[in-house]
Each structure stands twice: as structure tokens, then as C-alpha cells.
């Protein structure tokens, strides 16, 4: 047995009892003939005291920062110590000695730039701030799944090696598939639509890939996509579902991630339901009134979104009813005005974190939409053929996990948030 208790589980009530801790040497200090070890495990930090006359003192002299040790000792309640207790070591076992000096200071006393942090990533991830990010992400995914399970959704897994582009775009990574050209999936879009035509309500959490040329704090070549598709629904239905999901995610993190938020010194924004809905045409008018030369059909970029954020005075808002020509072929146009689509983006301040729409569920409409986009319907026959056999009206959305984490942690770069980011410059670690 390597440990009897995690550090955070030992309280002053354990005074006088023997416990075994295991973890990493976070900090070392010599003071008045005693050795103080700040030990770290997944639950936090704890103080170990090694007296000079202890049999453990000799080995404590060999320890380096980030060495992995096991400590058997007696708990002593002490209000001055972290968590109100310290462990007086009777035996220390060195399980793995770390090289010295470290290429990156895990304690955070010496700051490192982002390139150093990404190069020495595993040490960087051991920092308390990064462990807090990892734990908050886990809580977000837990709340996402729990909300959808309660709403009757089924978790699915779709192919990640595909024959053609999901949206007809050029940002594809080609792979050789048994002598044929195939691609890494940009999105589970087409397959999740087909699955909505099977079990009605589906979701997936999985990686997706885009040959992303943009070198910004918010773009990656590989990312985790949180996808939802819902039969017998339109874009208003899935926006309401998304509001519920986000509300539950933030609530879960505030309730179960208090320590992590404290470490990050951050509080996620409240999700006020209903989230404000701004029509695309209204957004264009606001931007024109601010001197922007923007015309119908233009995208709304980051500078423009910053202006909208200032004007609306809302951290979270939907931009709805985008021009049909600006959306993918599977997006349904509004019946009363085909120039507009039943679509939405959810914006956090100036960052798009979710995109969704009502989908086209009739084959002939899809074929026309493909042709209009300059795509060949025959290239999508694997998808279109199933619309001959009763495809229900449906709607859905995709949410980028790393971008959602910007909102949940306050960290302004997805490259810092993702444990091992992939962009144009990085393929390792």
C-alpha cells in the first residue's frame, strides 16, 4: 500500500494517528535542525516535518523538488500549519528522484513564459493552477453529460476517419487509409444527424481536427468538440437546451470546484436565462452606427464582437438568424425569408463558443444547398441516401471545450488550457 489517505482527507481530528501519504516534493526548507517538506498530491498540499533525530532525516537530505516519495508518520494538529495539521515523519521512502535543477519551477515562485511552459509541459501541468484547470474541465464535462442524460440523450461515437469534408471546406488533414485518401473529421456533423434519425437525441464528446492557419490564442488544429443533435426540434429548442446545460455547468463548478476557483482567483459569469438573443441584422446595424463598414453577409469578427459586447453589456449573448449563404449546406433557411437561416452563435464577450442551427431534413433541399455551395451531391451520397427513408426535423449545435474553458477559468488562451496543444508549431510533447 503506497498511501492510507490523500492529503486533503487528513484533518485535525486525526491528531496522534499514523497515516501514510504519497506524492511529490513541492518545496523543501531547513529550519532549526528540522526539515520541512511541502508534499503535493492530487488533493493539494500538506506539510511534513522531519526531526533531526528521526530515522527519516538521512533520506530527507537526498530529496529534490518533484521527487516522488512515500511518508509514514504521526499526525499532529497545529493551527499554524497548512490545513491545520502536519505529519511528523517516521519513515520516508524515495520512490523516484527528480533531476535538479528543474527546467521549470512547479511551485510558481519563478514565472515562466508560455513557450517554456509548453516545452516543459508536464512540469507545468503539475502547477496548482494547471491542476485546477484540469479539474474544472472534468467538472464541466460531468455536468454536460449529466444534464443531457436527464434530458433523455444518448452518448454516441462517430467515425473520425472520413471520406469527404463535412462542410466542404479546405481545412482538412489528409490520411492514407489502406491506399486510399481519407481525412480526419472536422466535425461529427453528418453522422450525428444520421444518429438523430435513429435514436432522436444524441451527444458526443470527441476530438476533431482542422488544418487551422490562424495563429491566435483561440485556435488549435486539434480540439475537443461537444456536440448535440436533437430530432423533432428547431434552433429555438436547442438554444433553450444549451442555456440549461451552461447554467448547470457553471452551477456545478461553483459548488464542487470552490478550491480550484480559489486557486485561479476567478469566478465564472452567471448564466442568466434566457440568454439575450440579438439578430444578425440588428448586430450589423449596431456596428454600422459605430462606424464599421460592414454589409449583409459579412462575418462578424473579434473586433466587431468586442464592440457588441460593450454595447449589450452582456457577457453571454446569442447572435441569431445568420445569412443563409454564410452557413453550411445543412443549415435550414427561414421559410418567411430564405436569405436568413435558422441559426445561432453563442458568444462569450468576443469569443464564439457554440454554433448551431435547425438542419435541412429533406433530400431535395440538401441537394440544392450543396450545389449552391459548389459541392457535388454525389460526393455526399453516403449521407443523402438516408434522407429517402424518413428523416425527422432536427437541430443541434457544437461547442468547443477549450473555448468554453476560457469562460470557466478566465484564462485567455486555449493553448494554456489544453494539456498538450496542437497548432502549426507544435506536434510534441
From Swiss-Prot:
Key word Nucleotide-binding present? yes
Keywords of the record, alphabetical order, are: Aminoacyl-tRNA synthetase, ATP-binding, Cytoplasm, Ligase, Magnesium, Metal-binding, Nucleotide-binding, Protein biosynthesis
List of residues binding ATP: 210-212, 352, 400-403
Residues reported to bind L-aspartate: 167, 210, 355, 359
Instruction: Write out the ranges of the annotated region (Aspartate).
Output: 189-192
Instruction: Detail which positions bind Mg(2+) 3.
Output: 352
Q: Choose one Gene Ontology CC annotation of this protein and give it.
A: aminoacyl-tRNA synthetase multienzyme complex
Q: What EC number(s) does the entry state? A: 6.1.1.23
Please give a single GO biological process term from the UniProt record.
Answer: aspartyl-tRNA aminoacylation
Needed cofactors, names only, are: Mg(2+)
Q: Where is this site: Important for tRNA non-discrimination?
A: 82
Q: Which reaction does it catalyse?
A: tRNA(Asx) + L-aspartate + ATP = L-aspartyl-tRNA(Asx) + AMP + diphosphate
Purpose of the protein: Aspartyl-tRNA synthetase with relaxed tRNA specificity since it is able to aspartylate not only its cognate tRNA(Asp) but also tRNA(Asn). Reaction proceeds in two steps: L-aspartate is first activated by ATP to form Asp-AMP and then transferred to the acceptor end of tRNA(Asp/Asn).
| PANTHER family listed in its UniProt record | ASPARTATE--TRNA LIGASE, CYTOPLASMIC (PTHR43450:SF1), ASPARTYL-TRNA SYNTHETASE (PTHR43450)
- Describe the protein's quaternary organization and the partners it interacts with: Homodimer.
- Protein name as it appears in the record: Aspartate--tRNA(Asp/Asn) ligase
